[in-house]
Curated annotation (Swiss-Prot):
Gene expressing this chain: pcm
Pfam families, per the entry: PCMT
Keywords for this protein: Cytoplasm, Methyltransferase, S-adenosyl-L-methionine, Transferase
UniProt-listed NCBIfam families: pimt (TIGR00080), PRK00312.1 (NF001453)
Full protein name: Protein-L-isoaspartate O-methyltransferase
Length: 221
């Protein structure tokens, strides 16, 4: 009974998160709202932080990394304009929460993580939750996943100095890429659309992410 009541409490908090933090701030894609209301965010943080999981703020996940605040996850997901047939590449698995959200909307998610402990933890959690349409890879995400390209959508979940051209090359024509781009401390959320004649970009506003480390990102200190 205690476990049942605890689960009901998390369901209620998840519903409040969607209504108060996400829908009220302009996220209106029903598939994004549905995914945010379904995926158990509290399982993607440590047990000590579970009670804070549905708050409107990022949380530490170890290795100097964070799980993004719910609104940012929803905003980036909606900006991708995901559809049910899409194959999506995620750069920076982290906690696995963003990939889990996408997996409830699209056909298949390919996610790359450079930190081994986070990669192992996320992969185990995907298996535990039955998210079998997520493929994981332990590698430098800034180089993408060429063998599985082209991708319909690409999402970068860490702040980059620029959008790596190698990732644009792995994006299908007509595809969307969303990434935080800027300095090490503050970025703008950029949406890129790849067309036959080139790329078109839109600035969606300011944001702040941990650094994108790798061959085509920031260098590790």
């Amino acid at each position: 009974m205690v476990m049942e009541n605890e689960e009901i409490r998390y369901v209620r908090r998840r519903k409040q998160m969607v209504e108060n933090q996400i829908a009220r701030r302009g996220i209106n894609d029903p598939f994004v709202l549905g995914a945010m209301g379904t995926v158990p965010r509290h399982l993607f943080v440590s047990e000590a932080l579970m009670d804070q999981a549905y708050g409107d703020f990022p949380l530490p996940i170890g290795e100097q990394q964070t799980i993004s605040q719910p609104y940012i996850v929803a905003e980036m997901t909606q900006a991708l304009e995901p559809t049910g047939n899409d194959r999506v590449l995620e750069i920076g698995t982290g906690s696995g929460y963003q990939a889990a959200i996408l997996s409830r909307i699209v056909s298949r998610v390919y996610t790359v993580e450079r930190i081994h402990s986070l990669y192992i933890r996320a992969r185990a959690l995907f298996d535990r939750l039955g998210y079998y349409n997520i493929a994981t890879r332990y590698s430098d995400g800034t180089t993408g996943w060429k063998a599985e390209s082209p991708f319909d959508r690409i999402i970068i979940t860490a702040g980059a100095p620029d959008i790596p051209s190698v990732l644009v090359d792995q994006l299908a024509v007509g595809g969307r890429l969303v990434a935080p781009v800027g300095t090490e401390s503050v970025q703008s959320l950029i949406k890129l659309v790849k067309e036959k004649t080139g790329v078109r970009s839109t600035d969606l506003g300011g944001c702040r992410f941990v650094k994108l480390i790798g061959e085509h990102g920031w260098k590790e200190n």
